[in-house]
A protein has these predicted regions:
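Helix C-cap/helix->beta junction micro-motif
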Residues: 96, 149-150, 269, 312
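Active-site phosphate-binding strand-loop segment of PLP-dependent enzymes
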Residues: 108-190, 195-197, 202, 351
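Hydrophobic residues in well-ordered beta-strands that form the structural core
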Residues: 75, 81, 102, 154-156, ...
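Phosphate-binding glycine-rich loop
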Residues: 31-78, 92-96, 102-104, 169
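PLP-dependent aminotransferase class I/II
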Residues: 39-43, 51-54, 115, 127-131, ...
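Short beta-strand->loop structural element characteristic of the AMP-binding/adenylate-forming
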Residues: 99-109, 317
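N-terminal "arm"/small-domain region of PLP-dependent enzymes with the aminotransferase-like
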Residues: 1-32, 36, 353
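Conserved coil-to-alpha-helix start sites within the AMP-binding
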Residues: 84-90
Length: 384
């Protein structure tokens, strides 16, 4: 379906000749695996955020796994996090043997609620992992105060929010370690890859150790007492990411223009929850254009709208399937009804196409198609 010229994709990377030239130069070089281009990408990304260290990795999942290992997280340790999250990130908790403790979210922002997290702290709790859902920053001051009060590590999932700002500071600057993802539908992409940032030199050293050996060390047969991963980013991916980083302001500005069209056309869409921006948030760069339907819409009505959009060749998936309702996490004892706000939000959310290649006519068509479908499902007026 992606090859259909009439298909309107959820995401479409903003690639210019700068990216093509950067990758071509690496392909013409003697090294395409991890090397100097990765080093440059790390340095420039750390400078962009104002953080001391950045460690490039093969994916955000691997990045969080390395972060947890760098902290010495062991089987049985508890990590408090949200079920309304990019599931690849939360999976990292399970993959290192730790226990994900899922808590409910704020109805308007989708962010992890500090008081809900506080109620789940036990002697086994080691860290809080909070995200910036779909680009909206969490309440980082409250989360930092909670973590400090209980001696916990604060980890930041910034996979959905590059460029967003909370009280004047960029996301990615609030966690003891913060994780970014550079795969679609993110604004900055490098195919597949991620970045972990920190200001702690010990944690940075541990991240690099657990990430695995660089090219010059791969011929050594020595094995240390702790076995590392092999989670390096290649110079090819780093070249693409570096070129994207240099154009990030331009990329985000294009997406803001598309957002303005959506906001204009969505005004006449009866029955949706308006986009929310918390008072302490200065700037938001959405990962997708997320539509929150009112409570008169059922989950099945939302799914019918998704199907109608698909029939019209519009990629607009449900957003999202909460972790506690997925089979594996059910085996940990979670059940439907445990996180009522998460379920209420997730049952009525869908993500509309959002990228810089959309024009105003296409946005108008997407919104009108969704509106027509909402009328057909007979949901009636909005109740939030």
């Amino acid at each position: 379906m992606d090859d259909d010229e009439d298909w309107i994709a959820l995401s479409d990377p903003d690639i210019s000749m700068a990216e093509l030239d950067a990758v071509t130069n690496v392909l013409k070089s003697a090294r395409i695996s991890a090397g100097e281009v990765v080093d440059t990408f790390e340095n420039d990304f750390a400078e962009y955020l104002g953080r001391r260290y950045a460690v490039a990795v093969s994916s955000a999942t691997q990045g969080l796994m390395l972060a947890l290992r760098a902290l010495g997280i062991r089987p049985g340790d508890e990590i408090i996090t949200s079920a309304y999250a990019w599931y690849q990130i939360a999976h990292a908790i399970t993959l290192v043997g730790a226990v994900p403790v899922l808590v409910d979210i704020d109805y308007w922002s989708g962010a992890l609620l500090t008081d809900k997290a506080a109620a789940k702290i036990t002697p086994n709790t080691r860290a809080i992992l909070a995200g910036n859902p779909n680009g909206h920053p969490a309440d980082w001051n409250a989360l930092r105060a909670l973590a400090s009060r209980h001696g916990l590590v604060l980890l930041e999932d910034s996979t959905e929010a590059i460029g967003s700002r909370y009280q004047g500071k960029l996301v990615g600057t609030f966690g003891d370690m913060s994780v970014f993802d550079f795969s679609q539908p993110a604004a900055l992409v490098c195919g597949e890859g991620g970045m972990v940032v920190t200001d702690d030199p010990v944690l940075a050293s541990e991240l690099r150790y657990f990430r695995g050996r660089v090219m010059d060390e791969r011929f050594s047969i020595s094995i240390a007492s702790r076995v590392p991963h092999q989670a390096m980013m290649s110079d090819m991916s780093a070249a693409l990411g570096l070129a994207q980083l240099e154009r990030l302001d331009e990329i985000l500005a294009r997406r803001k223009r598309v957002e303005s069209w959506y906001l204009a056309y969505i005004q006449s869409f009866e029955g949706i929850k308006p986009a929310y921006i918390a008072p302490e948030v200065d700037e938001i760069h959405w990962m997708t254009f997320l539509v929150h339907l009112g409570t008169r819409f059922t989950r099945s009505a939302r799914n019918q709208i998704v199907d109608d959009l698909l029939t019209a060749h519009i990629e607009a998936p449900a957003y999202c399937n909460p972790l506690h309702l997925q089979y594996f996490y059910g085996s940990l004892g979670y059940r439907k009804g445990d996180l009522p706000v998460t379920e209420k939000v997730a049952d009525r959310a869908l993500a509309l196409p959002f990228h810089g290649h959309l024009d105003e006519d296409t946005v108008a068509f997407i919104v009108q198609t969704a509106k027509d479908s909402s009328v057909n499902v007979g949901a009636g007026a909005a109740i939030y």
